Amino acid sequence: MSFFTKLFASIGIGSARVDTKLERDTYRPGDKVNGVVEVKGGAVAQNIEEIYISLHTKYIVESDSKEAMKKTAIERIRINDPFTILVDEIKEIPFSFTLPLDTPLTYGKVKVWIATSVDIKNAVDPRDEDFIDV
C-alpha cells in the first residue's frame, strides 16, 4: 500500500463510501424506520469510529412578513461500535428507530430526510442523505 494511496484516502479519494438503504420512503409519525447502512471499503483499510443516523427537517419561518427556510436536526442515533473496513469490503449495519411524533409532515417546501455520517479518523467523512415523505 503506497504512501499516496493512504494520502488520497485521507482527503476522500479512494476512501470508504456509505449508502443508507431504507425499507420504504413514506412514514407516519410514530412509525418504525428500519434500514441498513452499507459501508464499502475503498483503496485502503480504514478505522470507522462512529456511524450516526440523524433525522433532519427544513421548514419555513415567518418573521416581519418575510419567509426564511431553516434546517434542524430532530434526532441523532449512533448505530455502531468502532470497526475496521478493509479494502473493497462491504459491511451492512442494520438500524431501527421510531419516527418521533413531532416530526413535521412533508408538504410544499417542508422536507424531512435521514442523514448518515461516518467518522473516519484523519480522513474526509463520507455522508449520505435520503429524503422521506411523512
Predicted ranges, named:
Residues 1-134:
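N-terminal onset of structured domains
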